[in-house]
Design a protein with these regions (language model features):
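Extracytoplasmic "Venus flytrap"/periplasmic binding protein-like
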Residues: 42-114, 121, 145-156, 244, ...
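Short, well-ordered beta-strand elements
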Residues: 21-32, 54-59, 81-82, 129, ...
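Extracytoplasmic "Venus flytrap"
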Residues: 24-41, 373-378
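Periplasmic-binding protein-like
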Residues: 39, 319-342
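Long, aromatic- and glycine/proline-rich binding clefts that accommodate carbohydrate-like moieties
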Residues: 280-284, 333-392
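Periplasmic solute-binding protein
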Residues: 93-98, 117-154, 179-206, 297-306, ...
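Glycine-centered hinge/linker elements that transmit conformational signals in sensory
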Residues: 165-168, 207-236, 281, 285
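Hinge/lid segment of periplasmic solute-binding proteins
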Residues: 62, 87-139, 162, 187-192, ...
Length: 416
C-alpha cells in the first residue's frame, strides 16, 4: 500500500511538473530547410536544457508559404508565440496588428547594440515589430581570382562592370547576375537602383506624392542594363543565380552570407571548407561615380512575437538567446554565414571566425552603409511594376523612355 502511494505521489509530481512548463511555439522557416534545420534545433535544445521549465514547440513551412500562413493565422486570432520573418513580412504583420512591440520587451542596452537601420526597418509608427536574428543584408560577392585570370580588377563603378563584361565575354564568362529579377519582392533588387542613385518609394518623395522612380539617374541605369543585355552579359534573370558564382560562370553575386555554406556544399571541389576564403570575398558595391559610398538596403532575417501571445516575456528571453547569445552565434548563425546582430558580439569574433575577406567584407564594405527599407502598404503591388519594368529593359526591345513612362503612370495610380 505504501509503495502504491509513493508511486502515485511520484506520478502526480511528474504530471504537475509537465503542466507547469511554459510552452513557446516557434515557427521557423529555416528549421524547415535541410541545410539549416540541425543548427536551429541545436539552439532550441540548448535553450530548453538551460531552462528546463520551458518547452519550445517547433513549426515550419517553406519560405514562400510562411508569410501567407502567418497572415492567415493572425487574422484568425491564432498564431505562434515566436515567428521567424524575412523581407517585408514584419511590416505586413505589424500593420495588421499581429506583432508585439519589442520596445516593451527588449532591454535598451540590447537594442542599442544592434544596427539601427535594421531596427528602423522593422519599426512601424514607433512600434518595434521584430529584431534581427541574423544580419543578412546583401554584399557584393566577388571572385577576385576569376577577375585576375582575365586581367581585370574589382570594379568601382558601373562603367567598370560593363568594361569588365566586355572582356569576360571573350572567354564565355558572364559579366553580371540579376537572379532576383522576378516576382514582386522589390527588396531583392533595390541594391541595383540604390547604387545607381535611384530611390523608388522613398519616404521623403512619397510624402510629396512623388514615386522617386522617374529620374535622370533611372534613365541612365536602364540604358546601362539595356547595353548589358545587348552584350548578353547577364548570367540569370530569375531562378537561383547563385549557381553561376559557385561554378565560376560569373565573377559577382549580390547575396547574403548564406552563400558561404551554400557555396561550400554546392561546389566543394572549389569552395569546400576554407577554400572558399581563397576564392571569394565581399567587396564594395559598384556605384554611379567614383568617390560615392554604396547604399545597402536592409534585408535581415528577424524574429517577432505574436501580439496575442500569453508568454511574451518568456518568448523574449528565447528570442534574445536565439539572436544574441554566444551559443547561437557559434552553433546557428555561424552555419548560415551571416553576421550576429549584436555588434559587441561580432567584434569578439573578428580575430577568429570573422578573420577572412568574406565576413570582414560584410562588416567593412557593406554594413556601414545600411539604409532603411522603405516599406509601405502597396509594397508588393508597386514592386511588381518596378521589377516588370526592369525585366522589360533586359528582355525586350521596348524603348527605355516608354518603359519608364508607363511604369511611372502605373505607380502614380496605385500609390496616390
Amino acid at each position: 500500500m505504501q509503495k502504491k502511494l509513493i508511486l502515485i505521489l511520484i506520478s502526480v509530481l511528474f504530471a504537475s511538473s509537465a503542466l507547469s512548463k511554459t510552452i513557446i511555439r516557434f515557427d521557423s522557416w529555416m528549421w524547415g530547410e535541410s541545410d539549416f534545420k540541425a543548427p536551429v534545433q541545436r539552439v532550441v535544445d540548448e535553450y530548453m536544457r538551460l531552462n528546463p521549465n520551458v518547452e519550445i514547440k517547433m513549426e515550419a513551412s517553406g519560405w514562400a508559404e510562411t508569410r501567407n500562413k502567418l497572415m492567415t493565422r493572425a487574422s484568425a486570432g491564432d498564431s505562434v508565440d515566436v515567428m521567424m520573418l524575412d523581407s517585408d513580412w514584419p511590416y505586413q504583420l505589424c500593420t495588421a496588428g499581429a506583432l508585439a512591440d519589442m520596445n516593451k520587451l527588449a532591454p535598451k542596452s540590447y537594442l542599442d547594440d544592434n544596427y539601427q537601420a535594421s531596427l528602423q526597418t522593422t519599426t512601424v509608427d514607433g512600434k518595434l515589430c521584430a529584431v534581427p536574428n541574423a544580419v543578412n543584408s546583401h554584399g557584393w560577392w566577388t571572385n577576385k581570382k576569376l577577375l585576375q585570370r582575365n586581367g581585370l580588377k574589382v570594379p568601382v563603378t558601373w562603367d567598370d562592370v560593363y568594361n569588365n563584361a566586355v572582356e569576360l565575354k571573350k572567354n564565355d564568362i558572364y559579366g553580371m547576375h540579376i537572379w532576383q529579377m522576378c516576382g514582386d519582392n522589390l527588396g531583392m533588387v533595390l541594391w541595383a537602383f540604390y547604387n545607381f542613385h535611384v530611390f523608388p518609394l522613398n519616404h521623403e518623395d512619397m510624402a510629396k506624392k512623388k514615386t522617386g522612380f522617374d529620374t535622370p539617374e533611372l534613365k541612365y541605369m536602364y540604358t546601362w542594363f539595356r547595353k548589358m543585355a545587348k552584350l548578353d552579359a547577364f548570367a540569370a534573370n530569375c531562378g537561383d543565380g547563385r549557381q553561376a558564382l559557385y561554378f565560376e560562370e560569373v565573377p559577382y553575386l549580390t547575396d547574403s552570407g548564406n552563400t558561404l555554406p551554400l557555396g561550400r556544399n554546392t561546389n566543394p571541389d572549389l569552395l569546400g571548407g576554407n577554400k572558399i576564403f581563397d576564392v571569394l570575398s565581399v567587396e564594395r558595391f559598384p556605384v554611379l561615380k567614383r568617390g560615392m559610398d554604396p547604399v545597402i538596403p536592409v534585408i535581415d532575417h528577424t524574429l517577432a512575437i505574436w501580439s496575442g501571445s500569453k508568454v511574451k516575456k518568456e518568448a523574449w528571453k528565447f528570442v534574445q538567446f536565439f539572436s544574441g547569445s554566444e551559443f547561437a552565434a557559434e552553433n546557428y548563425i555561424k552555419m548560415t554565414g551571416s553576421i550576429v546582430p549584436p555588434k559587441s558580439l561580432a567584434r569578439k569574433r573578428m580575430n577568429n571566425e570573422y578573420d577572412n575577406d568574406i565576413h570582414k567584407g560584410f562588416l567593412n564594405n557593406a554594413y556601414p552603409y545600411l539604409t532603411v527599407m522603405p516599406f509601405n502598404k502597396n509594397w508588393h503591388a508597386a514592386g511588381k511594376f518596378i521589377i516588370d519594368s526592369l525585366q522589360s529593359v533586359v528582355l525586350t526591345d521596348e524603348p527605355v523612355d516608354e518603359i519608364i513612362k508607363r511604369t511611372e503612370k502605373s505607380l502614380q495610380t496605385i500609390l496616390f
